[in-house]
Amino acid sequence: MQPFINVDIGGPAQPLLKVNNLVRHFHLGARKGHEVVRAVDNVSFEVIKGETLGVVGESGCGKSTTARLLMQLLNQDRGELIFDGLEVGSSRLSMKAYRRQVQMVFQDSYASLNPRMTMEESIAFGQRVHGVSQKEAKAYAHYLLAHVGLEPGRFAHRYPHALSGGQR
């Protein structure tokens, strides 16, 4: 079974997400001479259609702040986010439209899975939101489970609490 979304970039690859000089500083203390934490300082990168971005770094280096900025859970001090050629938050690309296309996978597997949904339901949820039929979404969920080494017949109907940390 093939993934539902096949990206044919044909020709030169165009960035799907372009981050230009993203800045977020936190000001600690209200008095003159207060400390400034430069959590994200002029970060720039591009993600080409079909690519997956993973961010790795030392504790406190700005990974989570960068992710929050990309999701617009925090506002940047400076810089721009361009998604599919449109500036995020502009009149041409609403936050709702942007957030339907971009997602963040949290590093805490216990908090990122809905405890009231089976693995199959959790995996199929994103497909269903985008109009994929229940049958196709279920088949894709089974494909993905098998792809990561979890036998669908054994794991599709389990709830997150019934899986080990590594399986989550």
Residue ranges and their predicted role:
Residues 1-168:
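ABC transporter nucleotide-binding domains
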